Structures are given as C-alpha cells and as structure tokens.
C-alpha cells in the first residue's frame, strides 16, 4: 500500500510498531531535559513531548492545525528568537526536506547554549534501507535516508555534540502484524549482534558554545559568600596555633584544632 503522508504511514501496522519504540525512547529521555520552551518539528498529531517537564511546548509544521499549541511555519524559517529554545525534537524531518543543512542551521540558531536536539531518522544501513532500494514510492520510502555517521558529522560542524542515542527496530519491515510477530525474536538480540542495523536511530545532541562560562544566579553567589564568611569567622589564626572562636570573636580555649609547637 502506498501512503501519501508520513502521518498516514505511522498509523499502519509497521509505522505504529516503529513509532511505539521511538516514543518509548523519547519518554525515557525528555523528562531529564529542563528549560522553558520545547518544540516538535513535524507530525503534529502525535505528541512526542508528552513526558516533558517543560511547560511551554509547541508543534511546528507547514500545514495548518486546529489545535492550540501549534505554529504553522517552514522548518528552515522558524518564527522564534535566537537562543530561545531549550529542546527541539525532530521526528524524521531531515529525510523529507530539500535542504537538511539549512534546517539544522536554523535549529542551531534558535537553540540556547546547552540546549538539546533529539533527531529521529531512518537508518539506510538496515533492512529498512534495503527495502527502500526496490520500493521508492510513497512514505517513508521516497525519503532520502541519511546515515547516522553523516548526521553526527553535520551536527558537530554546527557545534552540536552527540551525547547519547540508540538504534531500534531490527525486524524486517513487514506490513502485517502476523509477520511482525514472527520476527520479533530479532529485537532482543539486535543490540548485541547487529547493533548498527536497526531500522531507525534516535540521537541526542547538545549545543556547545566554546569559550562560554555559565554564570550562576546572583542569589546563589551571595549565599556561597555568606557560607564561606561564616565558616572563616569561626576560626582565627593566632601565634600559638589555630584556635576556635565564638560568634563574638572571643577565643574558645576549650578546644584547640591544631597546636603549632
């Protein structure tokens, strides 16, 4: 069957099987990413940020959507300020865009320093990639599958350092539940025996700005100074040695920490 959109394909038995594994990885990763703003590029009907603790979350796609937290925009022209986004999820965006480099540059622009990007993509070096060789019509086979190695190179050129990730979906891309059940024995051993051949990869990268020093809040610095001052005030250096003093500065002769002879 030929699917006219990626969303329709993800509702097929094979697409649902793949999306279930991608969502499981996202549900594990996004709760540990904090910030103020998160965006999801594409597939607006699927809430891939459902487990995120970031309150302000929006989806972005070129198509209009009736839901409230949706922005209609092109991926290479995001309507967000520079360095304003803490988390960006890209579910299979780069395979279906004419200029993936331009999209990545735009994401790098809107990401804050230490912001995270989660890239989901089809692995060309897998059984999914093999099927694409003889099936190039419809979604997702008409897309340009980009290898994980190349994605990492593109990200690193922009200062986005890969931090973690995994591959999944080692079964052949069967379109029916019956054949999927027969091949599910391949999933548990996939990471061990053919880890690079997963049908999809899921990659987390962090935006690094070299030469940048993170500045703690002013109240934090003030509290640290007060603690250091209070600790230093309890002791004073005298000629015979280091002695304990009370809050008023009087020497406490009942306990010597160290005596210098």
Question: How does the language model describe each region?
Answer:
Residues 28-78:
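Class I SAM-dependent methyltransferase SAM/SAH-binding core
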Residues 163-188, 196-198:
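Conserved catalytic loop of SAM-dependent methyltransferase domains
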Residues 116-145:
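Conserved class I S-adenosyl-L-methionine
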Residues 76-88:
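A short acidic, Gly/Pro-enriched loop at the edge of an enzyme's catalytic core
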Residues 142-165:
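Short alpha-helix
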């Amino acid at each position: 069957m030929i699917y006219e959109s990626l969303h329709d394909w993800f509702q097929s038995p094979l697409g649902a099987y793949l999306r279930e594994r991608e969502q499981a990885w996202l549900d594990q990763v996004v709760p540990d990413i904090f910030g103020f703003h998160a965006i999801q590029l594409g597939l607006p009907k699927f809430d891939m940020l459902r487990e995120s603790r970031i309150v302000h979350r929006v989806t972005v796609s070129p198509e209009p959507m009736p839901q409230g937290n949706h922005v209609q925009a092109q991926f290479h022209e995001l309507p967000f300020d520079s360095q304003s986004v803490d988390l960006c999820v890209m579910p299979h965006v780069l395979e279906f865009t004419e200029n993936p480099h331009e999209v990545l540059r735009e994401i790098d622009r809107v990401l804050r320093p230490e912001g995270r990007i989660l890239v989901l993509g089809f692995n060309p070096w897998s059984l999914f990639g093999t099927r694409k060789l003889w099936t190039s019509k419809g979604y997702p086979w008409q897309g340009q599958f980009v290898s994980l190695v190349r994605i990492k190179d593109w990200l690193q050129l922009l200062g986005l350092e890969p931090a973690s990730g995994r591959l999944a979906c080692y079964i052949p891309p069967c379109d029916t539940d019956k054949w999927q059940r027969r091949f599910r024995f391949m999933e548990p051993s996939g990471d061990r025996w053919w880890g690079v051949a997963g049908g999809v990869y899921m990659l987390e990268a962090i935006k690094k700005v070299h030469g940048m020093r993170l500045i703690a809040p002013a109240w934090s610095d003030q509290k640290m100074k007060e603690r250091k001052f209070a600790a230093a005030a309890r002791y004073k250096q005298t000629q015979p040695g280091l002695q304990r003093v009370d809050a008023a500065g009087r020497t406490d002769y009942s306990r010597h920490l160290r005596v210098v002879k």
